[in-house]
């Protein structure tokens, strides 16, 4: 039984959620509302809600990260000092870094420590996140791969780490009776570790060497990033595939449901994933996933999908071709995918978090 009030850090809430912001909002809706006070820019009908500034949200661009860190350190820190019998739950590794505050923090990955690339947020990952995790009362990881990474890279004891399964939106993501259309789907941010250039080259090779696939299309769903998107689109143009690649910068849950049910397969060729929520969402729709053999993706797929080497363009191309050719596998996963996805439930995730907090 939880004896202390949970202060829920909802500063990462987004009105167009993806990735961590999806997790943030879904967990806030699933944890027992009688146990938490939600601090967020808006509420999904939570009863104990304390409004915070809207400009902390990732919807407000790069500077929102700096504003949110300042808010975490000072405003959230002062709030927690006043609520001395409370414990902070943060659905991402952000919390006041001074000691004396009890916190439980959810970690999704330590990607920038594994695959460093030039980003203004690199110091955040190298210096700030490790301090937050070392100060935390408990660390929750979304996969065994992430838990091992936290242990190995930050020298944090496994005794401090708990592994839980995330969930997906069962209300909106499900199999539909749709005829498969002639396209592959990517749902990913336009950052280097998502490996989009290699996918584009593999797609080009697939169409080039298989005349029967000239009508095949690629739909890329992900927020425009001025650092990387222009170069990806230029690569499309150089390869001569810009007329068969559709760049979609955001979709609603209803649109995502249609895309996941209509595509031949979801392609996730990431260099590393701490979890891989789109893979789970695709399985929930009974859709085949062609996925990287790195990070947590093999855990999520549980031998149900096609694994590829993300460093090897030929391997990605081969995985795509198998997805088109192996109709038996596609039919099998139409049935087994939703059954596997049922193991992942936000309510179960929330109950596990409540149990972890109750033991502190």
List each model region and its residues.
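Carbohydrate transferase catalytic cores enriched for Leloir-type hexosyltransferases
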Residues: 1-360
């Amino acid at each position: 039984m939880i004896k202390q009030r949970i202060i829920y850090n909802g500063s990462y809430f987004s009105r167009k959620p993806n990735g961590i912001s999806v997790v943030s909002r879904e967990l806030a809706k699933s944890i027992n509302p009688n146990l938490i006070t939600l601090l967020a820019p808006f509420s999904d009908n939570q009863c104990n809600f304390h409004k915070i500034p809207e400009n902390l949200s990732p919807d407000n661009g790069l500077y929102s990260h700096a504003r949110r860190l300042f808010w975490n350190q000072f405003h959230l820190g002062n709030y927690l000092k006043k609520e001395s019998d409370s414990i902070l739950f943060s659905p991402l590794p952000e919390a006041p870094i001074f000691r004396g505050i009890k916190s439980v923090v959810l970690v999704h990955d330590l990607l920038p420590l594994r695959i460093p690339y030039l980003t203004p947020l690199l110091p955040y990952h190298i210096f700030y996140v490790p301090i937050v995790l070392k100060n935390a009362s408990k660390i929750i990881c979304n996969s065994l791969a992430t838990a091992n990474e936290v242990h190995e890279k930050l020298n944090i004891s496994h005794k401090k780490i708990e592994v839980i399964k995330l969930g997906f939106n069962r209300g909106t993501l499900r199999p539909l009776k749709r005829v498969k259309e002639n396209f592959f789907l990517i749902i990913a941010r336009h950052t280097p570790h998502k490996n989009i250039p290699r996918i584009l080259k593999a797609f080009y090779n697939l169409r080039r060497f298989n005349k029967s696939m000239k009508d095949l299309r690629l739909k890329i769903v992900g927020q425009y990033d001025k650092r990387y998107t222009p170069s990806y689109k230029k690569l499309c143009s150089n390869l001569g595939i810009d007329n068969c690649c559709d760049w979609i910068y955001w979709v609603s849950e209803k649109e995502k449901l249609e895309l996941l049910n209509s595509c031949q397969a979801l392609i996730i060729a990431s260099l590393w994933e701490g979890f891989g929520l789109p893979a789970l969402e695709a399985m929930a729709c009974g859709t085949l996933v062609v996925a990287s053999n790195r990070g947590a993706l093999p855990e999520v797929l549980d031998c149900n999908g096609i694994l590829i080497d993300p460093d090897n363009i030929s391997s990605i191309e081969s995985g795509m071709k198998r997805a088109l050719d192996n109709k038996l596998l596609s039919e099998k996963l139409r049935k087994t995918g939703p059954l596997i996805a049922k193991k992942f439930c936000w309510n179960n995730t929330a109950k596990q978090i409540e149990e972890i907090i109750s033991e502190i």
